[in-house]
């Protein structure tokens, strides 16, 4: 993200090909692909906010390389639900699977899924040899697609009390380290910027999770505002 900036939101090395749509398969969102291990993992993602890293690759492969969805919308869908989500890592991983950030696409067939996820399923659209993947038609179950329309609801916070001449540590969605300058007498602010969450929305479960993490930091105050607004409160006059 530091190196490429917003460029990570576009195909980095190669244009993803083929692309039949810019949405996400309804069957993936509804955990109804017919691949039991994948469907169960998506259901667990909604409940817990977690998904095994290998399973994330399987889901991305089905979304991008089997359903032929451009990677961006499915990546946004997964990021929205992950408690440990990092947009840069997520976006670049999806691009790697889709072949837009690698020299080939990533595929996993049913035997691979069965091996690593204690499954014995057969006769699915993934129950093929790897040589067949490049010529497979989009399975009927994956053809219905939708956009992923999501938003993060941030609750307005009460005014916080800050001293202008006191060192201020600013925490954010990606930095809630309870040991950060733990031995210093400073004022601590968890800053939730609406513009960030508008661009990279996450679920209410994710917001609740970071609020729980913030409870581990003594004296931290929560502020829903842009960074510029915060600087006006703490910069010396």
Please report, for each region that a protein language model flagged, where it lies by residue.
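Trp/Phe/Arg-rich N-terminal binding region typifying the photolyase-homology
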Residues: 1-17, 30, 43-47, 72, ...
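Active-site-proximal binding-pocket segments
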Residues: 1-154, 159
